Amino acid sequence: MARIRARPWAIFIFLTWLIPFTTTIWSTGIFARGETTLPLLFKGDTAYSAIQDQLNYGNRIPGTTPRKECANYFKSELAQYATVIDHNYTLHGIACQNVLGVLNPTESGSIVILGAHYDSRAKADKDPISPDSPCPGANDGAAGSAVLLELARVFYEIRTKLQVQIWFVFFDAEDQGSGGLSGFGWAEGSQEFAINLETFLGSTPLSAVKLMLLLDMVGGTGLRFAKDGWTNSEIQELFFQLGRDLGYASAFPTDPHYFSKSLIDDHKWFASRGIPSVDFIIDFTDPSGPWPYHHTTGDNLAHISTDSLDITGKTLERFFHEYYVSAVDGGGGKNPFWGMTGDWFLTEAGAILISCVFGACVVLGTILAFKAYTLKKHEVLKE
């Protein structure tokens, strides 16, 4: 039986190719997985207080004084952590206003948008008793906005570690479609913002906006997130798995309700512009579900849960730790693959290609050198 004899030079050739190749693979982060050591700072109680603050202004219906006062409240709170920008526009003859807060403005190469609407619906049309009364909007409006404010505080604390620019956007005129306010459609405030993104980007290209994360009805009791057709499914599944890893399996079920693209929410306009987007939203269509207060007067503080606010906020906080804080600073140092759309071959694949070419050159050079050596040795023996 023939024996295969391992030759040291063959092992050397293999290693000269393998070492630079694997080093490049790991350094680019394609398979990198880190364990973050950063503590979770999000406080559901603080977010709950921010919901209460918003409700204290009254019904935040577009064009009303409570809506204006609530926008000023956001601006005052955000000014502690971010650069504040007004976005004023008119819809159907009514003055509307989005509020933008920019954290880490110098990190212009990578931008993540966190959004929520803050207007409350003018008519509680699903309410069996008072369908013409306005909705308090504790969950559908105030909850997502409250989580944004608390995340602004949290991320400000670690701003020097975050390798990303974060936009906190509070949208007006989201919840007035189908008869809420005469002439209004759904999510018109966010549509205005998405159409005019370049105005806020200035000289920064649209490609710098890597991700849009929307929070809609995230503070109600019995939190159970759904999925939809406008959301990037791969990124959303990453969030669902992250939530389960944090112990929030009931909020991130393996069999969530699925909305098709018929769901019109604020993230739709960003997804339509090619920005990967994720909607954190519940199944609000089931009257016998865990939160049956959608577009009713029951959407009040009595049906808000600090646990739900904690789950939402801490899952998002951990996400940023893992993908936008380096391992050196206690983060996960993972690769935000959604940020490489259109540029992948210039970054990761390019690095791999260079590594392969380098490895191939080393192998070829080693083979040629070995052949030259053996040929010379053979000639010496002949002499």
Question: Over which residues does each language-model region extend?
Answer:
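Hydrophobic secretory-pathway targeting helix
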Residues: 4-36
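Alpha-helical transmembrane segments
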Residues: 21-24, 357-375
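N-terminal capping segment at the start of a domain
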Residues: 26-71, 288-303
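A non-catalytic alpha/beta surface segment that caps or lines the substrate-entry region
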Residues: 40, 49-106
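Solvent-exposed loop/turn segments at secondary-structure junctions
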Residues: 60-62, 90-94, 105-108, 118-122, ...
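Acidic/histidine-rich catalytic neighborhood of metal-dependent amide-processing enzymes
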Residues: 133-237
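Active-site-adjacent substrate-binding region
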Residues: 211, 218-344, 348
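Cytoplasmic C-terminal tails of single-pass
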Residues: 374-383
